[in-house]
Amino acid sequence: MDTMTFCVPCLFGLEGLVGDELRRLDLQNVRVEDRRVFFEGDFAAMAKANLCCRMGERVMILLSEFDAHSFEDLFQGVKATPLERFIPKDGAFPVKGYSLNSQLHSVPDCQAIVKKAAVTRLGEKYGLGWLPETGETYQLRFSIMKDHVELFLDTSGVSLHKRGYRREANLAPLHETMAAAMVNLARYRGRDFFWDPFCGSGTICIEAAMIALNRAPGLNRSFMAQKWSCVPETIWQQARTEALDREYRGEYHILGSDIDPASLEIAQQNARKAGVGKLIEFREADATKMSLPTDKGLLVCNPPYGERMLEQRSAQRLYGAFGRHLKYADGWKKYIISSEPEFEHYFGRQAVKKRKLYNGRLQCNVYMYY
């Protein structure tokens, strides 16, 4: 198979981090755009990206791109795409996509046209008047932006933020990809004492442990392309072997605390499922009263937002109490994510730096104190 172009969509604000991550994986020609990152490679690169990418949402093959101002343009562009390189005659190929700022603005109509064109192309190539679609799934995705169409083939299936360890969560889940991003922003590599005082279901601590171990986040899950006839099974076997060979061994100091014992029980279950249960200490404690576990370290947390678990005023009071509690914790570098636009006011001090991110569709800032 020739070199392919791959696209890794990501949450807004994580593009640079994802680009750096893909470069560290030795993937080639990495290019960063808004909410997505491109790279080039073969199926081995695709498998590595799926297994090892912590902050991207999925890995897709760019099949073709073209301009379309009419449904006929869209039909002909898709029909000219060599889908048979990947999709066999019995393959199922559902279509998803979106359109923004384009003449072709009806997504259901665009889906129907893309599907019709794909059926026409594959029917002609395989000499079939009807395609059974009884085989494995080859998810087609399209993007139409300012009348420019990109057609993709999704290799991941379920979004990469679903690692396979978090089957239960409390009321305020932070995406695993966002948790990994926060740990990366804190530059945690396993040497510092790491503490999440609002650990909830344990996601930030678990992602920190996996980063400390250099453990590939996708080892405990499967991917759509694993079932494709065009991708040799040895590709996945080799990628998993190489990922395991890159793991570190060591002792790490990771603490997750929370005032809610039910959340802590879920966190412990999730940590065990992730294979890092022995690396994380979970402790029931009030973040506004708990003694600092050590004189210095990294504090990374996602305190309750007013939009969800607490009323807004209660959340604001919590931020104030937490800020007063940490007033003299000068040895701690703090990375706190919040959707409260006046967080610094309630916390009691201005951040040294802040970075706008989106947790799903919720606009947040990571406030950095060091």
Regions found by a protein language model. Give the residues of each.
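Short beta-strand/turn micro-motifs composed of small residues
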Residues: 10, 258, 338
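Residue-level signal for inorganic ion chemistry
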Residues: 22, 95, 142, 302, ...
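C-terminal edge-of-domain segments
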Residues: 140-156, 367
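SAM-dependent Rossmann-like transferase core, predominantly class I methyltransferases
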Residues: 151-187
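Conserved S-adenosyl-L-methionine
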Residues: 174-291, 307-308, 314
